[in-house]
């Protein structure tokens, strides 16, 4: 039993929690702005737990979708489905179980949030298959991750205002950037096995395109702060985040997969300082 639990934890990537934080940060941005710095405690707990559950579910369905590809990619060759330690049926049952628990939590919220959750579940379930059909699965991941933003506004305020959609777009831009960095790690393997990604699409222009996307993201976050009346601490956080974006571009210069992965991981700090700026604004307002 213990060994099975370890395998299921690996399927859910509980040993690599950075993905949970990358999904959590924009959710917290949204909850703090929607709640003017004081989100409803029940809503906050539901979303934190829901983020962990749905990120875990996303990892499981991703491994199920990639079970034929992962044995041929160096980074993924030891995943449970790739090695045969877990079966496809186990993965699907685990995915369904995680989604059911997450939906049970959503039922504690208002009808608008419940309705939005169906679109979120569809995005999460279909994202892993996008790399077969489009070079933009990273943007699709952004939509899946970003869907927590309108849901957070709906849960906190009962509406989905323009600010929610602007934050959603910002999250799509952000996820496209950091998941492109992630895709750059596997680019050579992905070319061999025939799957698509923005890393492949951008090719030698990857640094330029991701830098432009980061610039657009920072400008959008600046505009959101202006619209919402956020003050000094928010812009301080945004300035630090801009520094992190520059550092990520510096890491890409070496053209080494290990540095691409470091650039990906650094986005956890990017998301954290944005949240810190939002939280400090409301604490000191």
Curated annotation (Swiss-Prot):
Swiss-Prot/TrEMBL GO biological process terms: ubiquinone biosynthetic process
UniProt cross-references to Pfam families, sorted A to Z: UbiA
Chain ranges passing through the membrane: 17-37, 41-61, 92-112, 135-155, 158-178, 216-236, 263-283
Enzyme Commission code(s) on record: 2.5.1.39
Subcellular location(s) of the protein: Cell inner membrane
One annotated GO molecular function: 4-hydroxybenzoate polyprenyltransferase activity
Keywords: Cell inner membrane, Cell membrane, Magnesium, Membrane, Transferase, Transmembrane, Transmembrane helix, Ubiquinone biosynthesis
Cofactor(s) essential for the protein: Mg(2+)
GO cellular component: plasma membrane
Pathway where this protein functions: Cofactor biosynthesis; ubiquinone biosynthesis
InterPro entries assigned to the protein according to its UniProt record, in alphabetical order: HB_polyprenyltransferase-like (IPR006370), Prenyltransferase (IPR039653), UbiA_prenyltransferase (IPR000537), UbiA_prenylTrfase_CS (IPR030470), UbiA_sf (IPR044878)
Organism superkingdom: Bacteria
Top class in the EC scheme: transferase
Catalytic activity: all-trans-octaprenyl diphosphate + 4-hydroxybenzoate = 4-hydroxy-3-(all-trans-octaprenyl)benzoate + diphosphate
Main location: membrane
Membrane topology value: Multi-pass membrane protein
Gene3D superfamilies: UbiA prenyltransferase (1.20.120.1780)
Function in brief: Catalyzes the prenylation of para-hydroxybenzoate (PHB) with an all-trans polyprenyl group. Mediates the second step in the final reaction sequence of ubiquinone-8 (UQ-8) biosynthesis, which is the condensation of the polyisoprenoid side chain with PHB, generating the first membrane-bound Q intermediate 3-octaprenyl-4-hydroxybenzoate.
Similarity field: Belongs to the UbiA prenyltransferase family.
NCBIfam families in UniProt: ubiA_proteo
Protein name as catalogued: 4-hydroxybenzoate octaprenyltransferase
Species per Swiss-Prot/TrEMBL record: Nitrosococcus oceani (strain ATCC 19707 / BCRC 17464 / JCM 30415 / NCIMB 11848 / C-107)
Name of encoding gene: ubiA
């Amino acid at each position: 039993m213990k060994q099975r639990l370890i395998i299921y934890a690996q399927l859910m990537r509980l040993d690599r929690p950075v993905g949970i934080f990358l999904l959590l940060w924009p959710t917290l941005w949204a909850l703090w702005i929607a709640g003017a710095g004081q989100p409803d405690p029940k809503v906050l707990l539901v979303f934190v737990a829901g983020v962990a559950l749905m990120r875990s579910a996303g990892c499981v369905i991703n491994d199920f979708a990639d079970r034929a590809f992962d044995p041929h990619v160096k980074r993924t060759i030891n995943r449970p489905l790739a090695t045969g330690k877990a079966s496809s049926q186990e993965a699907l049952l685990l995915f369904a179980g995680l989604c059911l628990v997450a939906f049970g939590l959503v039922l504690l919220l208002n009808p608008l949030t419940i309705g939005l959750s169906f679109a979120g579940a569809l995005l999460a379930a279909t994202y892993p298959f996008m790399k077969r059909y489009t070079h933009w699965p990273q943007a699709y991941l952004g939509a899946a991750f970003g869907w927590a933003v309108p849901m957070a506004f709906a849960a906190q305020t009962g509406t989905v205002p323009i600010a929610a959609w602007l934050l959603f777009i910002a999250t799509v831009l952000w996820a496209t950037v950091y998941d492109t960095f992630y895709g750059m790690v596997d680019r050579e393997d992905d070319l061999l096995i025939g799957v698509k990604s923005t890393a492949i699409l951008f090719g030698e222009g990857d640094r330029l395109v991701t830098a432009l996307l980061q610039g657009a993201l920072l400008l959008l976050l600046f505009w959101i702060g202006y619209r919402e009346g956020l003050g000094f601490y928010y812009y301080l956080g945004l300035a630090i985040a801009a520094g992190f974006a520059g550092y990520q571009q510096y890491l890409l210069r070496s053209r080494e997969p290990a540095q691409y992965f470091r650039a990906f991981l650094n986005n956890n700090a990017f998301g954290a300082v944005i949240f810190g700026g939002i939280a400090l604004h409301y604490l000191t307002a």
